[in-house]
Amino acid sequence: VERVLVTGSSGHLGEALVRTLTGDGVPVVGLDRRPSPWTAVVASLTDRDALRSALRGVTHVLHTATLHKPHVGSHSRQDFVDTNVSGTLAVLEESAAAGVRGVVFTSSTSAFGRALTPAPSGPATWIDETVVPRVRNVYGATKTAAEDLCELAALDPGLPVVVLRTSRFFPEADDRDDVRAAHDDTTLKLVEFCHRRVDVADVVSAHLAAARRAPELGFARYVVSAPSPFRRSDLAELGSDPAAVLERRAPALAALLAERGRPVPPVDRVYCPDRAVAELGWTRS
């Protein structure tokens, strides 16, 4: 990795990537619509002139810029298409024209949509790369559309692209009112690390590993999440008695929650990042 363009450099992940690359002595250009100390180019993704200028001399692109799930209530579907689909197309086309060696596209486990949600009172779902997405909202729909454009760019004109479907890494509180009312934020995040959350530092290392491997992979897609103590054999019990499974698989965490008098939140899914670890050589903290 010789020179990197990070889109969305004013965001949580984009800033972390720019900080890490800069600290490692890698030349990096940050591009975002919002100014920040980590953003050198303030421009929209669809500003092709600004994008071409930012791509001069760039060998790898880390494309994190996006409208997120919390924006569903404040932005139109067209806004999502403009940023997440048209913006990604612009990044892919201009990257190919600039001779970029590899692009890493930050997708989301939200792309799985309704496939994430088990039947009422049913077992938790096991989520890996074999699960077929079922659309739930415009965020997931535009992420899967952008992923398709990434695969198309890998086929023609042959731009190496790695898609990372990342689980939760944002510091904000859960966006579901009923969940926030039933559980405190610390408890939610601690348990989520067992099945649907990842540290932002590990998301950074996954992007850097993907950038290094992109030229030889051509196109690939991975789930990126923290290692889970849960197993496939736990899924039925996770759906009915997550506290019992937590006590068995993560006894220290179960004891901490019991000591604090905190109930164990529901566990409806388990993300499996094994393929990313095996194929990217991704190491996690």
Annotated model-derived regions:
Residues 46, 79-90, 133, 137, ...:
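Glycine-rich NAD(P)-binding loop of the Rossmann-fold in SDR/ketoreductase-type enzymes
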